[in-house]
Amino acid sequence: MSIGYKDNLMSTILAKDRKCEFPINFECSPSQITLMPEMFSFNNERKYQTLIPLMKTSHLIDDDLKDKLNKCAFDFFSGKQANRTSDGTISRLTASGKTSPILPLQNINIVKAENTGNGKSDPYSSIKISKPTKTVIKLKSTKTNTAGQRTRHFCKICSTGFTTSGHLSRHNRIHTGEKNHICPHEGCGQRFSRHDNCNQHYRTHANKKKRNWKRREASS
């Protein structure tokens, strides 16, 4: 069914209780559509009520008009249901000066969910909006403070920080040039400032011995 001429018509659709009314703007003539309560079915098990034309009367309504009706009905009922939960809380917070009317949900932590038609609350309808608390900020600052306390030992030459005095003394050998650790291999005599570096160097001699021994076995 095509809509012939354009006319801004404010129609009223009665909900199930026949008390809630809302305007819908669409382009059609009043004679082309008749809105009756029995033309629409209500789904009480869903969180939001939507107006769905029944099969016996759906041929009377154009497809474009069906989309407009369902969209307006969804927006109306969703806005009404949201206002039931948030109007009281927002008005109290606005009156006390804790929040601004522009951002009413800025300081709201939890909004209780309304019961749906089957008597169970929707677990996804609760809203949690919170700012970082003082406890979290304290923990972060404590972590940085403890990290600063760990580096208590500083080099007097390059100002590098270390956690223990042993690490600092080991670092000072770089500046002084001390090499107290000598390679125990015969004929090597190479000196190192760190013991682990000396051990690592000594393993190279042991690996050379193993390689030479394997070559001798292979040749024999």
Swiss-Prot record:
Zinc finger (C2H2-type): 153-175, 181-205
InterPro entries assigned to the protein according to its UniProt record, in alphabetical order: Znf_C2H2_sf, Znf_C2H2_type
One GO CC term, this protein: nucleus
Protein's cellular compartments: Nucleus
Entry keyword annotation includes Metal-binding: yes
GO molecular function: DNA-binding transcription factor activity, RNA polymerase II-specific; RNA polymerase II cis-regulatory region sequence-specific DNA binding; sequence-specific DNA binding; zinc ion binding
Keyword Transcription belongs to the record: yes
SMART domains membership: ZnF_C2H2
Task performed by this protein: Transcriptional repressor.
Protein name: Probable transcriptional regulator NRG2
Organism expressing this protein natively: Saccharomyces cerevisiae (strain ATCC 204508 / S288c)
Recorded name of the encoding gene: NRG2
